[in-house]
């Protein structure tokens, strides 16, 4: 594979090979990352990348779309079946653009949008001041209860009654507990707001029936297709309301996008087909088992898990008990072939560029075939590194780094990723 790249552009070929090596021989614990199947990868690298297809199936602005229409219809129908939805738009290039399309379909610029604070586990597109959502809309942010570190629904209701938002956004990027969508819908109805649920992180769990389906209550559901869904990098919008669906379609095209990425849409179709299988349901169940096992193992080794545990694929780890910052931990673990990301925690006292926590997730480890037994060992490796961080630059004792790195590589060889497959 990649022989033509090797001949044409040796520099990029080297980048691809080095990145393959990093993925193959490293433990990936970033909660938003996963590894696609060879089938998804092949679809993304197909001749479909050559086709312009502005518009929607049977309503294109270009000729020659008869086969890409089939691909997009397959993606839409499979997404609808997977999430029990009446309508699906599979064209958003990303989760951020899925959210933008949903917001533009439901509310005029200057309207009030209420979302979860980024520092409490939300996402940039839920109203962060540096994001389009915080610049185009008036934003009200809710957070977690400082004692329980779970969503404070009383605060959500109080803020909604006070500010009367046009859109309420539920979902997050670093929230490990199951969200009560029924409560959110009741609050939205009370103030006349639309409820948008961003399920980007837990979409795979929803598809497998492990996490409640937000479409039972939300006016609109958005998602990415990577993360727990294990598909290509892209976005998805679902709704059961025909008029909202029409508005979403206009908001995506011609509103914020031109031509859709047909090779990615085909890969989404492959991903949705994989997600409809019994094997995928078993995989999602194992993700949650692994997350619970990893959280418990870290807790048993002296670390604090925000909110006391996890119901999903991810956890937020408070590093204050070890007096290590998220920045130093991310760097130190990276030296040892363990990839994580620094993350703020509720009641954060440090800058987001330094942070007091790390966010961990188990989808990528589970894709390799790892189970609870490996989570115990990985917790050991993580804590060994964290206890040997020398400074804020994340330097680690060389002997410790080599010992951990060697074991990580051994583990990865026991549970290979793409070796022999691509």
Swiss-Prot record:
Keywords in alphabetical order: Amino-acid biosynthesis, Cytoplasm, One-carbon metabolism, Pyridoxal phosphate, Transferase
Reactions the enzyme catalyzes: (6R)-5,10-methylene-5,6,7,8-tetrahydrofolate + glycine + H2O = (6S)-5,6,7,8-tetrahydrofolate + L-serine
Disulfide bonds: none
PROSITE patterns: SHMT
Annotated site, Plays an important role in substrate specificity, chain positions: 226
GO molecular function annotation: glycine hydroxymethyltransferase activity; pyridoxal phosphate binding
Binding site for (6S)-5,6,7,8-tetrahydrofolate: 118, 122-124, 243, 351-353
Gene Ontology CC: cytosol
Gene3D superfamilies membership: Aspartate Aminotransferase, domain 1, Type I PLP-dependent aspartate aminotransferase-like (Major domain)
HAMAP family hit by this protein: SHMT
Name of the protein: Serine hydroxymethyltransferase
Organism: Fervidobacterium nodosum (strain ATCC 35602 / DSM 5306 / Rt17-B1)
Lineage: Bacteria, Thermotogati, Thermotogota, Thermotogae, Thermotogales
């Amino acid at each position: 594979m990649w022989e033509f790249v090797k001949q044409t552009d040796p520099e990029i070929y080297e980048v691809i090979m080095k990145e393959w090596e990093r993925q193959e021989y490293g433990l990936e614990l970033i909660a938003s990352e996963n590894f696609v199947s060879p089938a998804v990868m092949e679809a993304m690298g197909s001749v479909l990348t050559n086709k312009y297809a502005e518009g929607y199936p049977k309503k294109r602005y270009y000729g020659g779309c008869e086969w890409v229409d089939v691909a997009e219809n397959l993606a839409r129908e499979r997404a609808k079946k997977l999430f029990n939805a009446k309508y699906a738009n599979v064209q958003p290039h990303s989760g951020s653009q899925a959210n933008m399309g949903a917001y533009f379909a439901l509310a005029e610029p200057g309207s009030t949008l209420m979302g979860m604070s980024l520092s409490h586990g939300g996402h940039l597109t839920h109203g962060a001041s540096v994001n389009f959502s915080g610049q185009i809309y008036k934003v009200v942010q809710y957070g977690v209860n400082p004692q329980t570190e779970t969503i404070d629904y009383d605060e959500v209701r109080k803020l909604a009654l006070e500010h009367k938002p046009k859109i309420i956004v539920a979902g997050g990027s670093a929230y490990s507990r199951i969200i009560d969508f029924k409560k959110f819908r009741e609050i939205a109805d009370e103030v006349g707001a639309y409820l948008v649920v961003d399920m980007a992180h837990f979409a795979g769990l929803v598809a497998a029936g492990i996490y409640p389906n937000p479409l039972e209550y939300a006016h609109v559901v958005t998602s990415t297709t990577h993360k727990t869904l294990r598909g290509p990098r892209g976005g998805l919008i679902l709704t059961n309301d025909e008029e909202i669906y029409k508005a979403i379609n206009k908001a995506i095209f011609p509103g914020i996008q031109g031509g859709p990425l047909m090779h990615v849409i085909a890969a989404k179709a492959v991903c949705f087909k994989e997600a409809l299988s019994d094997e995928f349901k078993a995989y999602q169940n194992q993700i949650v088992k692994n997350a619970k096992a990893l959280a418990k193992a870290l807790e048993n080794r002296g670390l604090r898990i925000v909110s006391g545990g996890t119901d999903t694929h991810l956890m937020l780890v408070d590093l204050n008990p070890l007096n290590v910052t998220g920045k130093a931990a991310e760097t130190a673990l990276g030296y040892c072939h363990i990839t994580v990301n620094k993350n703020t925690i509720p009641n954060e006292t440090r800058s987001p560029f330094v942070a007091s926590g790390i966010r961990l997730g188990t989808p990528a480890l589970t894709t390799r075939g790892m189970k609870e037994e490996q989570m115990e060992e990985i917790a050991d490796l993580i804590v060994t590194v964290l206890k040997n961080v020398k400074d804020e630059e994340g330097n680690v004792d060389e002997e410790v780094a080599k010992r951990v790195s060697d074991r990580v590589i051994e583990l990865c060889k026991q549970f290979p990723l793409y070796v022999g497959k691509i």
